[in-house]
């Protein structure tokens, strides 16, 4: 199923899947030396709230650090990258060359910054793929959410795709909400 036709290229479900898989894989491999594996994906277009992380995941009550970056232009949307808090701390240590003790002394703000930057890189790769397909757009600044067992709802007109990755035994979720041509 395609979102909308463009003079250049159609954005299909497969295109979205390939682009987010490439983005997550490239950023994790380059920045962290990890190679995440896509486990499954799910489509939702009805504007319902986010059940998968809560209802289907054994980590429903695990605290998460969630980075989000938007893109605006010929394609508009948001991408949320969910990391369990413990994995976000490991990623931060690896990304910044810190020990757990150093990170504990520096506090959660450092984890927030690292997850925000990682999310910005992932969404940047995804956005560049959209631009290469004829949908010029630019990024918004990263934001961070922290918590557990919460819901994010999409608007009724947005197409939503949710992708689950395994990265060294940790679940990473990419939640994409987007519209083309508005």
Which stretches of residues belong to each language-model region?
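N-terminal auxiliary interaction/assembly segments of multi-subunit proteins
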Residues: 1-182
């Amino acid at each position: 199923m395609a979102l909308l036709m463009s003079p250049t290229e159609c954005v299909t479900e497969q295109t979205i899947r390939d682009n987010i898989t490439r983005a997550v894989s490239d950023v994790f491999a380059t920045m962290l030396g990890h190679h995440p594996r896509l486990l499954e994906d799910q489509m939702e277009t009805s504007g319902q709230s986010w059940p998968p992380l809560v209802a289907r995941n054994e980590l429903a009550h695990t605290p998460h650090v969630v980075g989000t970056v938007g893109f605006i232009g010929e394609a508009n949307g948001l991408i949320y990258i969910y990391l369990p808090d413990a994995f976000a701390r490991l990623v931060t240590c690896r990304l910044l060359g810190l020990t757990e003790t150093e990170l504990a002394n520096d506090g959660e703000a450092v984890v927030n910054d690292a997850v925000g930057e990682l999310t910005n890189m992932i969404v940047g790769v995804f956005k560049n793929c959209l631009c290469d397909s004829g949908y010029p757009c630019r990024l918004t600044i990263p934001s961070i959410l922290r918590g557990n067992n919460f819901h994010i709802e999409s608007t009724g007109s947005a197409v939503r795709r949710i992708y689950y990755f395994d990265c060294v035994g940790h679940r990473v979720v990419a939640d994409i909400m987007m519209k083309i041509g508005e």
